[in-house]
C-alpha cells in the first residue's frame, strides 16, 4: 500500500478540500498529535472557508521527532474527528493540507531552514505547544547553539535573526497548558536577551513590535488508532497508508488572549469559526468555565459513580441517576455563578455531556480519580464556596460530591502500599487510590474512625483545603449525613437523593 502524498491522494479519488501550494505564514514549534488535530486543522479550515492561502512550517522541538515522516508525506495527513454531537454519533474524515513541511533544527540544514523561515516576508504567526515542561528558562542555552536546547531559547534565536533581517514583528500564540503561557514565554525570552547581552533595539522589537498571546486550548486528542485491524480496514477504505493518521474529538475551542483587533489579523472570524476560535482581552473566565464545568463535572460525579460500580465515563452518561446528578450540579449550582454569558455556559455544559458520551473513547473513572484531593479543591471547592456566598445555603450536589470524595478515599481500606491506598468497593474488587503520600497516610491513619470523627478530621485539615471547612455553616452536618447515606445505601442511592 502506497503511503499518503499528493500524487497518491489524487490516485485514491479523494474529493475533499486540498491546497497544494501557498506561502508559509506560520512557524509552529511542535509536530505532535495535538497540534496537528487542533491548530493545523483550524488553519486548514481557514484556507478552505476564508481563502487564507497559508501554510504552516512545523519544527520538532526536541531531537527525536516526526520531521522525516511528515516530509515523506509532503505534510499531508488524515484527521478523524470522532464523538457525539447533539446526541448523534459523529465520525468525520478530512485530509489536512495546511502543513508544508517539518524541520529538524538539530540537524545543521534544518536549523538553517528554520532561520530562513524566520527571516521570510511571508511569516506572520508563530505557534507553540511544547508541553507543560516546554516553557522553561535554561541558563545553559547560548545564542550560538545549533539549536538552543530549550524552546524559549530557540524562539529567541528565531526572533533575533528576524530582527537582524529587518522584518516586521510577529504574532506569538502559546498553547502550552500552563497559567499565563504567553506571558511566561515572553518572560523567558527577556531572560535570554539579558543573559546573551542582546541590544536594546531587539528588546524593544520583542516587547513592542511582536505580540505575545496566551491561549486556552480545549480538545481531547487520543492520537493514532492502535487497533491494527481498524488501521488495515481504513487503509483499504482510503486507498493509501498513513502512519501520521490522527484522531481527535469533535468538540474544539481555541481562546486567544489579546486585543480583539487580532480577530481581523487572524483568519478565523472570516472563516465563520468565531464560536470555536476567537480573541478576548481576558481569557480567565473561559479558563474558569473549562475548569468549573468540564473538569469540575468529572471530579464531581466520578468518585461516587465508581463506588456505585461504574468503570468508564460513557456508561455513566447512560444512567439516568448519574446523568441527572451531573446535570443538576452543573446547571443549578455551577453555571449560575460563572461570570460569563449564561446561555453560552449552558451550551458548554450540554457539549460536556456529548463529550463524556463519546462512543470512541473509553475514559476510565480510575484514571480521572488521580489526585482527587487537589482536584476537588481547585475544580469544585470554588464553585461550592461561591454558591454558599451568593445563596446563603449549601449546594445539594456539590455538597454530596465532597462526601463521595471522602467515601472513595475511605471505603473499606485494606492497606497502604508503595502504589497507593488500597480500598475495596461494594462490587467486591479492590482499587488503589493515588494521591500525594501525606494524603494517603492521613486516610490510612483514620481508616477506623466513625463517620463524624472522619468527616471532622478531613474538613479541619487545612493542608488539604487551605482553610477549615467546618466553618461553612451546616457543611459538616450535611457531609456526615451524606457519607452515612453512601455507606449504608450506596453511592447511586445517595446521588438519587439529590434529585
Task: Tell where the protein language model's regions lie, with residue ranges.
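Substrate/ligand-engaging "lid" and interaction regions
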Residues: 1-499
Amino acid at each position: 500500500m502506497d503511503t499518503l502524498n499528493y500524487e497518491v491522494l489524487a490516485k485514491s479519488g479523494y474529493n475533499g478540500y486540498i491546497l497544494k501550494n501557498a506561502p508559509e505564514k506560520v512557524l509552529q514549534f511542535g509536530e505532535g498529535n495535538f497540534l496537528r488535530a487542533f491548530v493545523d486543522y483550524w488553519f486548514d479550515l481557514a484556507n478552505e472557508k476564508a481563502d487564507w492561502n497559508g501554510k504552516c512550517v512545523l519544527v520538532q522541538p526536541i531531537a527525536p521527532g516526526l520531521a522525516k515522516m511528515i516530509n515523506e508525506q509532503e505534510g499531508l495527513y488524515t484527521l478523524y474527528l470522532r464523538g457525539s454531537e447533539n446526541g448523534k454519533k459523529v465520525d468525520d474524515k478530512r485530509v489536512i493540507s495546511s502543513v508544508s513541511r517539518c524541520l529538524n533544527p538539530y540537524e545543521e540544514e534544518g536549523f538553517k531552514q528554520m532561520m530562513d523561515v524566520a527571516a521570510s516576508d511571508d511569516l506572520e504567526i508563530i505557534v507553540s505547544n511544547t508541553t507543560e515542561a516546554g516553557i522553561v528558562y535554561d541558563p545553559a542555552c547560548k545564542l550560538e547553539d545549533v539549536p538552543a536546547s530549550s524552546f524559549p531559547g530557540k524562539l529567541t534565536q528565531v526572533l533575533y535573526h528576524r530582527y537582524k533581517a529587518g522584518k516586521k514583528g510577529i504574532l506569538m500564540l502559546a498553547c502550552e497548558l500552563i497559567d499565563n503561557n504567553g506571558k511566561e514565554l515572553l518572560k523567558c525570552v527577556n531572560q535570554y536577551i539579558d543573559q546573551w547581552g542582546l541590544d536594546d533595539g531587539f528588546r524593544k522589537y520583542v516587547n513592542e513590535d511582536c505580540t505575545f498571546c496566551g491561549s486556552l486550548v480545549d480538545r481531547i486528542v487520543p492520537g493514532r488508532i492502535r487497533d491494527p485491524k481498524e488501521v488495515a480496514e481504513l487503509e483499504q477504505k482510503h486507498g493509501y497508508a498513513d502512519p501520521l493518521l490522527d484522531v481527535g474529538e469533535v468538540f474544539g475551542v481555541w481562546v486567544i488572549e489579546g486585543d480583539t483587533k487580532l480577530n481581523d489579523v487572524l483568519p478565523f472570524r472570516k472563516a465563520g469559526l468565531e464560536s470555536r476560535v476567537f480573541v478576548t482581552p481576558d481569557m480567565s473566565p473561559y479558563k474558569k468555565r473549562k475548569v468549573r464545568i468540564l473538569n469540575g463535572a468529572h471530579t464531581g460525579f466520578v468518585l461516587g459513580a465508581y463506588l456505585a460500580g461504574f468503570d468508564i465515563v460513557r456508561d455513566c452518561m447512560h444512567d439516568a441517576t448519574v446523568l441527572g446528578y451531573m446535570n443538576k450540579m452543573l446547571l443549578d449550582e455551577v453555571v449560575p455563578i460563572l461570570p460569563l454569558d449564561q446561555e453560552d455556559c449552558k451550551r458548554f455544559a450540554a457539549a460536556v455531556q456529548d463529550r463524556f458520551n463519546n462512543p470512541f473513547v473509553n475514559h476510565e473513572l480510575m484514571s480521572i480519580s488521580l489526585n482527587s484531593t487537589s482536584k476537588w479543591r481547585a475544580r469544585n471547592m470554588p464553585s461550592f464556596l461561591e454558591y454558599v456566598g451568593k445563596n446563603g445555603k449549601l449546594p445539594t450536589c456539590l455538597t454530596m460530591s465532597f462526601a463521595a470524595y471522602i467515601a472513595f478515599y475511605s471505603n473499606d481500606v485494606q492497606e497502604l502500599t508503595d502504589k497507593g491506598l488500597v480500598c475495596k468497593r461494594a462490587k467486591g474488587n479492590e482499587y488503589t487510590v493515588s494521591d500525594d503520600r501525606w494524603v494517603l497516610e492521613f486516610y490510612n491513619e483514620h481508616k477506623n474512625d466513625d463517620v463524624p470523627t472522619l468527616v471532622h478530621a478531613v474538613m479541619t485539615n487545612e493542608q488539604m483545603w487551605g482553610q477549615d471547612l467546618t466553618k461553612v455553616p451546616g457543611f459538616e452536618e450535611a457531609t456526615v449525613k451524606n457519607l452515612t447515606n453512601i455507606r449504608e445505601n450506596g453511592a447511586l442511592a445517595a446521588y438519587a437523593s439529590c434529585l
